Amino acid sequence: MMELRVEHLCKRYGENTVLDDISFTARVGVTRLLGPSGIGKTTLLRVLLGLETPDSGTVNGDKFRWTAVFQENRLLEGLDAEGNLRFVLGANYNAAAQALLEELGLGDVGKKRVRDYSGGMQRRLALARALLAPSDALALDEPFTGLDAENREAAMRAILRAAETKIVILSTHEELPIPVPCQIIEL
């Protein structure tokens, strides 16, 4: 069974302690990091992914193939939606990828370049790219930012499908209804 273990994690920036003795275990399904802006949710995700080193504690995040969506979408702005997905998926781009674009409301954007998308459209495309990339675990930093209620619901459905087979670590500062049991880590 896949299991992400975080034990006594601490992270400081100078005199500022951002993560203080964080411990949890995450398995296939959704683990939600909940807390106000600036509390350390993004820092924790970056430590899990190995992008930052903790000052103390352990995490076995390097045991997994991760995909991530951070607050910056990091898309290829000169390409359209399909081009962004093909860049990640290569020959594995298929009907399922196109269906996910449709589900997330991006099926009718044609050859419009990503740089011309709204912020919400870019967010949904970044999420689609992460959901489709081969991985064991997803790190989703505020994945619903800029989404209206309808698109938020579509994104949630897609995330929950991924959580059937992957570890999903989802950060949010809002109390969002997640229609399945999930672990909540309050920071």
Q: Model segments located where?
A:
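Q-loop/switch helix immediately C-terminal to the Walker
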Residues: 72, 78-92, 96
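ABC-family nucleotide-binding domains
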Residues: 141, 148
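Helix-to-loop junction immediately C-terminal to a conserved catalytic motif
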Residues: 49
